[in-house]
Amino acid sequence: ASPAYIREAGEPDTPQSLVNFRCINRCFPSGEKYRWEFISPSGEPSEVSVRGDLVVDSDTAMIQAAESGLGIAFVYQSLVTQQLSAGSLVRLLPDYHYPADHFCVYYPSRKHIPVPLRAFITWVMAQNKSILSE
């Protein structure tokens, strides 16, 4: 969220309290809105259906909307490093994190994995570790 939005609305103290704030929603191609996912400091997962009239379909649009003070965004921290450093965005709920390890790479068979596919899988795993370490 932008500092201006935080001054106006305050800060949430838990993911569940996000329902009391104007959030920027993300829409899947199906039209369904994304439920924000969190892991608590104690390791408990939770999901929140946030409120807000603005619905976007890209990280770029979500970041721009948040910088403009239109609400709270939910994006990977690595995508907003510059904005956080510059002070145009403020990180909220620092004790909670996104369960980024919950994704899969599907491929036909483990018996004969082509070298390019093996390289891709290795790269995806490395990217995931990088995101989780932030």
Language-model features: locations:
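Short secondary-structure boundary/capping segments
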Residues: T14-Q16, C27-F28, P45-S46, T81, ...
